[in-house]
Every structure is written in C-alpha cells, then in structure tokens.
C-alpha cells in the first residue's frame, strides 16, 4: 500500500503541491476526544496521512480543502471536526448518502465495499488509541486504506447515480457540485450538496429559553400529578396502569375495547379515541398528553448545552428522503411547546413554510386537471374542496367545513377509506361526521378529482400483478413500495423532501452572495427556521422566500408554490 506519513510543514507543502491540481480529493479523519489526530487525503495517484499533532501551521491544508470538493464516507462526522479548525470544503460527495440513494439496505463503508468491490475491510483498528504519542505502522496503514477504498468506490457510485431517472431539475447540472464531481442526477446533486448543510445545522444548534423550559416543566408535572390524583379519587384506579384501566372501562363503563395480539384488553390511544366522550377516557387521554409534554421537556432539558440543544440529524431518515432528528428529536415538538425556543439576545427567527405543499405536489404528480386549475387560479385548496364536495359557494364555507376539507384533502389523496376519513376528521381536525357522510364525501371527492382515483387504481393493479410498485419522485429519488399506503405516500412526501433540501441549498447560496450571516437552526418537513440579527430579519425573510419559490419552480412546473413566513423571537407563528 503506497502512502506518505506527513509530520512536518515541509512534508505538508510537498503534499499540497501534488494535490492542488485536482478539483476534488478523497478524505477521511481519525479523531480522539474533540481533536483530529490524522487527516487522510489523496487524489487519483497520491495518498497522504497528515498528523495534526505534529504540524503547527495547517493554513496550507485549510486552503487546499476549502477550495475543493471532498469525497468521503459519512462526511458529516468529518465536517463537524474540520469546522473547528476553520476547514470546510466547497463541495461534498458522500458514499454513505450515495448508498441510501441507490437503495442499499446497509450503509457502512465495509458493507458498500463488500457489495461493490467484492472484499471485506479490516476495521479492527477503528477503535484503537489515536491519541498515542507514536502511532503504529498498522494504524497508519488502516487510516490510509479508507482513502484508497474511496478512490475505487467513487467512480462506480457516481456512474450508478447518474443512471437515476429524473423528470425535472436540469438547472442543477450547472451547479458547483455537479461540475466538480461530474454528477448528472438532480437528486444526487441536491443530496451531496446538502451534506454540508446538515453539518452546519448540527453545529448551529437551536436556542432555548432555559427559564421558560424549567417553569413549563414544573407546571406540566404539577398539572399531571393533580389530574392523576383526581382520577384516583374519583375511580380508585391508577390511570397509568393498563390492567386497572381496562378493568374499569370494560366492567364499570361497559366499553367494547379491542384486544391485543396476546389477548389482553387494549387501552392504547387508538383504542380509546372512539370513546373520548366518556369521562374517564377523556381524563386518561388528557393525562397521557400531559405526560408526553413532560417527557419531551425533560428530553430537551437533558440535552441543553450553553442555552441551546444540538440534535443529531439523519439526512435521509426515511425512504422518502425526509430527515429525522434525535438527541433530542426536535421535529416532533407540539405547537404548544414551540414557544420555549427563543433566539439569542439581539437575534430573531425567520420561520417560513411551504403552503399546502403536499396538495400542490400531489396535483402535479397525478396531473389532476381540477386541482391544477384551482392552484393556478390561486385558490385556497381546502376552501375550494369544501365547496366542491358540499355543493356550496366558496365564500359560504364555514371554518368547520374548511377543517373538514383538510381531512378530506390530506386523507383522500392517499386513498383512505370512509371509516378512516371519519376517524381522521375527528382525531386530526375535531370535526365529527358519520360513516355514511364520510362515504358520500369520499365518492364526491373522487368523482370531481378523477385523476386521484385513476392513480390509486393503477397502483392497486400494479401491486396485485407484481407485488411491488417501483417509481421515483419528480426529482428522481427512487422508491420501491410493497403496500398501497407506501406506494402513494412515497412519491408525494419524497418530492416534498427534495423541495425542502433544494430550497435550503439555494438559500445558503443566496446568503453567501449577499454576505449575510444567518444560521439554519431547524427543518421540519415543510418548514425552515433561521436565526439572524433582528436588523437583518426582513432581508433574510425575502431571501428565504425567494429561494423556496425558486426551488418550487425547478421541481413543480405547473403548480405555483406559495410560502408563508413570520419573524418572531420565539418559534411560534403568533
């Protein structure tokens, strides 16, 4: 194995001289604690293992990496370490992200090498002592090998990505990421560029009003205990005991509750939702809601660091391409709790979300003429749907009828049953309708929005004949589905994920052009939260909205994209 171990400034200068003609470099790091020990870097012919413990002046290395593209595996990890040294590459290609896009089940470097190159890597030195004063030859060889492997993997994975289908996004072929790595797949271009954004999102963290969090947690815990005591005094049953609760509800209140697979009476939320009008059920559901809020507040408190939380984001957290977050999860914060997130002194949040984006994507994906026309005319889709299925003028639609239309739209584009619609309307939107009413509304929806019925029928037919449905989002993200629900969800939600990520990339590029400092602090499916100085907020809002609408024009060719924004020092829309 050919590589050079670099331990001094002269050796570093020589290495950089040989590497500086390459538009992209292969990179990996070995770390210990919060420091980088080794930076392994190479081009098509040369591999260097650079020991940062031995080199004082790393400015030449910083300049080399910052001006180039980097190929690596799980690059978010390396980028967060490099950032501490003032190093951040201008473009990224991540073989782990490529593995997700190509549909592999396992994404470690070893698994990818085994799949594509046909051999196994020796990972026994991964957890060795990288802080040792003298590194062994075996450690150095292990470190160098990761770069050598990346050199073999990159062209194979790039060529496979370039075969992904795409209906949209040809504008992205002109971007820096596309040119540096010779990428032709729009969705791959977006995901590779987005690696940098996820690293920055984790570095930035999300600011919290610590006093508000502490007070809210105490208040919620007090209220929870009060409700539990009230329940016990009234019914002499512990509301947190499934066994005691099941006995109370079935024997005293004669509720016909379903059984679990083990034959026990089920008292989970789903089983109880049909009986919300029964007093003990109502109380139990309130207690559970309070407990969930308390648990979430505790989770946030556990992860506080310098007045912020620093979640881990998984760039592709689902088949759809949607992100997920953990430690803490800040994508499932209840609206009542969002006010505990507060921008730092002198700063504010710019909060922007895509308006009715799932419906807009669905209308374009299935090419429904009625829905397309309504969006082109700038109609409020929920009000419009209510008027269509209820046979009323749009201006006569009540607030409750519009709520019902939300359940109809978001439920029926995905083909839920009449029973499912009645439950969804009650649970999700607080509107009660009978099974018969749900059936009539369902029939009227599909009679008017015919393309959705035709799409659902095609999906069912393909599932019956082939056992699976294969397809891709409008930007070319592949998916394979074995159930009807997945087959209709994946292309819509996947296109939504593509759209959000592209919007963030355009926003970052536009910020850099203007030289404005603003931090991305959270992303939730169709919402972008940015922290910036109060004086810059209006300008940042304008740039963010423009970026989101431009992303919309790239992915959605027929439906206009609308964006709703607020400027607030707390993460609330009020």
Swiss-Prot record:
Q: What Gene3D superfamilies does its record include?
A: 3.30.70.370, 5' to 3' exonuclease, C-terminal subdomain, Ribonuclease H-like superfamily/Ribonuclease H, Taq DNA Polymerase, Chain T, domain 4
Q: Which reaction does it catalyse?
A: DNA(n) + a 2'-deoxyribonucleoside 5'-triphosphate = DNA(n+1) + diphosphate
Question: What are the record keywords, sorted?
Answer: DNA damage, DNA repair, DNA replication, DNA-binding, DNA-directed DNA polymerase, Nucleotidyltransferase, Transferase
Signal peptide (from-to): none
- This enzyme's EC code(s): 2.7.7.7
SMART domains given in the database record? 35EXOc, POLAc
What's one Pfam family the UniProt record gives for this protein?
DNA_pol_A_exo1
NCBIfam families assigned? PRK14975.1-4
Name of this protein: DNA polymerase I
Report the source organism. Aquifex aeolicus (strain VF5)
Task: Provide the taxonomic classification.
Answer: Bacteria, Pseudomonadati, Aquificota, Aquificia, Aquificales
